[in-house]
Structures are given as structure tokens and as C-alpha cells.
From Swiss-Prot:
It comes from the Bacteria. This is Uncharacterized protein TP_0338. One of its GO terms (cellular component) is plasma membrane. The chain crosses the membrane at residues 53-75, 105-127. It is found in: Cell membrane. Keywords: Cell membrane, Membrane, Signal, Transmembrane, Transmembrane helix. It is a multi-pass membrane protein. Its main location: membrane. Residues 1-19 form the signal peptide.
Length: 162
């Protein structure tokens, strides 16, 4: 068993110390290399932005969804009895726990709102790009100047109408 440990240790920890680097002339740098503009296509950038916005908005949207659901429960119970259960307003009041179905509904609403935020951003950016592209096309649609051709350049007897 000791031989297995020695072999494992030497293969993974000692041998890499004596390995040759592929490029000894190049000094290693810890600085990250920035991405180039052509490294990722547009749909990859948009997918990353959609993902980042949706996942980033999810915790905030979840918190706001639960608070909104509690406010809705407060308003619904206000007409039947005094709101003695809402713990955010009345200190020491007990908040009845949400059922599994209610939690699933609130999380589903939070996921839907988060995805909607990402879709709105993607749609807004696509419309903005299309407007910019159209304005560039319109600026390139400058009419050509009228070209005057002198009549002397036509050779007599080459009438194309006959």
C-alpha cells in the first residue's frame, strides 16, 4: 500500500516539477487576457447577458414576490378579521407558514418575472440594434449626383431606337 502512495505522490506532485514548459522564452503572466470583439458571436453574448440578468434578478424578485404575497394575504384577511398575524407590522405576531403549493406558486412567479426581465432586455437590445442598423442604411442611401454626358460623345448613326 505504501508503494501505491509513493507512486501516486510522485506522479501527481514530484514529476510535474521536472517537466518542461512548452515555451520557456515567454514569461508567464498572471494578468488575464481581455476578450476580443470577434471571440464570441452575438447570440452567445446575448445568451450570456440573458442568463446573467435572469439569475441576478432572481433573489431580489423572489424576496419581492414573497413580500407581495404576504401583503395580498393581509388584504384578503383584513375584511374577515383584524390582521393580527402579519409579522412584519406587528412585533411578536406569528406568521402562518406557507403551504408547499403556495411556495411553489410564489417561486414560479419569481422565476417567470426573472425570465421576463431577461427577455425584455434581449428584445430591447435587438430593437435598438435594428434601429441603429436602419439609420446607418439610410445615411448610406445618398442619391448619386446627376451625371451630364455631352452629346458630342455619341457617334452619329448609332441610334438604338431603330
Amino acid at each position: 500500500m505504501a508503494r501505491v502512495y509513493i507512486l501516486f505522490f510522485s506522479v501527481f506532485f514530484v514529476f510535474p516539477l521536472f517537466s518542461e514548459d512548452a515555451a520557456r522564452d515567454v514569461e508567464p503572466s498572471d494578468a488575464p487576457v481581455p476578450y476580443e470583439d470577434t471571440e464570441f458571436s452575438l447570440w452567445q453574448k446575448e445568451l450570456y447577458r440573458f442568463e446573467a440578468l435572469s439569475i441576478g434578478a432572481f433573489p431580489i424578485v423572489t424576496l419581492l414576490s414573497f413580500i407581495t404575497y404576504d401583503i395580498i394575504r393581509l388584504i384578503q384577511q383584513w375584511s374577515t378579521k383584524p390582521p393580527t398575524w402579519w409579522a412584519l407590522i406587528i412585533p411578536g405576531a406569528e406568521l402562518p407558514p406557507l403551504s408547499t403549493k403556495e411556495r411553489a406558486i410564489v417561486f414560479g412567479v419569481a422565476v417567470g418575472i426573472s425570465v421576463t426581465i431577461g427577455l425584455i432586455d434581449v428584445t430591447y437590445r435587438a430593437v435598438k440594434r435594428a434601429i441603429h442598423r436602419r439609420s446607418l442604411e439610410r445615411s448610406q442611401l445618398v442619391p448619386d449626383p446627376i451625371e451630364l454626358v455631352p452629346l458630342d460623345s455619341f457617334v452619329e448613326g448609332t441610334d438604338d431606337s431603330t
